[in-house]
Swiss-Prot record:
Belongs to the PsbK family. The gene is psbK. It comes from the Eukaryota. One of the components of the core complex of photosystem II (PSII). PSII is a light-driven water:plastoquinone oxidoreductase that uses light energy to abstract electrons from H(2)O, generating O(2) and a proton gradient subsequently used for ATP formation. It consists of a core antenna complex that captures photons, and an electron transfer chain that converts photonic excitation into a charge separation. One of its GO terms (cellular component) is chloroplast thylakoid membrane. It is a single-pass membrane protein. It is found in: Plastid, Chloroplast thylakoid membrane. Residues 1-24 form a propeptide. The keyword Membrane applies. It holds the Pfam family PsbK. The chain crosses the membrane at residues 36-56. This is Photosystem II reaction center protein K. The lineage of its organism: Eukaryota, Viridiplantae, Streptophyta, Embryophyta, Tracheophyta. It comes from Lotus japonicus. InterPro entries: PSII_PsbK, PSII_PsbK_sf. PSII is composed of 1 copy each of membrane proteins PsbA, PsbB, PsbC, PsbD, PsbE, PsbF, PsbH, PsbI, PsbJ, PsbK, PsbL, PsbM, PsbT, PsbX, PsbY, PsbZ, Psb30/Ycf12, at least 3 peripheral proteins of the oxygen-evolving complex and a large number of cofactors. It forms dimeric complexes.
Amino acid sequence: MINIVSLVCIYINSVPYSSIFFLDKLPEAYAFLNPIVDIMPVIPLFFFLLAFVWQAAVSFR
């Protein structure tokens, strides 16, 4: 139980700092990758949805 509480506290303390990374811009040499970088945070959601599509295809065995 203490581990869960400590993980929640660590997450809450890191939230203000994680938003800093979203405000940064890529260096000019990597500016052509901006569209890919914008989509990257959504990629894990595609895997999550793929699991449901896969289960629906096998009739939720």
